[in-house]
Amino acid sequence: DAKTQIKMHSTAGEFIREVEFPGIGSASGFGGKRTDTETFYSFSSFATPPSIYRYDMLTGNSKLIRRSNAKADPEDFEVKQVFYKSKDGTRVPMFIAHKRGIELNGKNPVLLYGYGGFNISLTPRFSISRLAWMEMGGVFAMPNLRGGGEYGEEWHRGGTKANKQNVFDDFIAAA
């Protein structure tokens, strides 16, 4: 659902566990040899600056190794993923991020950002300008419009050529 999810399996294909991340966000950089018992990854979210973690594959624990200098406390913000219906009834995911404690009553300024094209996936990533927006009481909303790569080729084709109107309908429905 447009956020990183990692499931660990044995070399025989048996499910071991799901990797837990510090929140809804994007992780990358996993790698290693078959004999390694740890790996490193980068994690970032709307409220978490890029951070490097060490993941122990034996215990399933992640340990923060390094975080960028951006002055942001992820605990000060709330990030959630919701789903809404577009004009044609298609279920579309959207991330909503804001400062913790803000009442979402329709009176908050909202920055609605979307892109639905060229099979490009929009995932939760850190941005200092979005963080400043949320610090000042703004709400950041990012729908995953058809045309992107979040759900594979069918989702991508659903927002291209003769289906391009779906991208605009998805965005309007998000508002």
Show which residues each predicted segment covers.
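Short beta-strand elements that form the blades of beta-propeller/WD-repeat-like
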Residues: 1, 35-45
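Peripheral terminal and inter-domain segments
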Residues: 1-2, 66
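Residue-level signal for short segments within beta-strands and strand-turn junctions
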Residues: 8-10, 43, 54-56, 98
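Cap/lid segment of the alpha/beta-hydrolase catalytic domain
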Residues: 14, 57-61, 65-175
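A short beta-strand motif characteristic of beta-propeller blades
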Residues: 15-20
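Repeated scaffold domains used in trafficking and secretory/extracellular systems
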Residues: 25-32
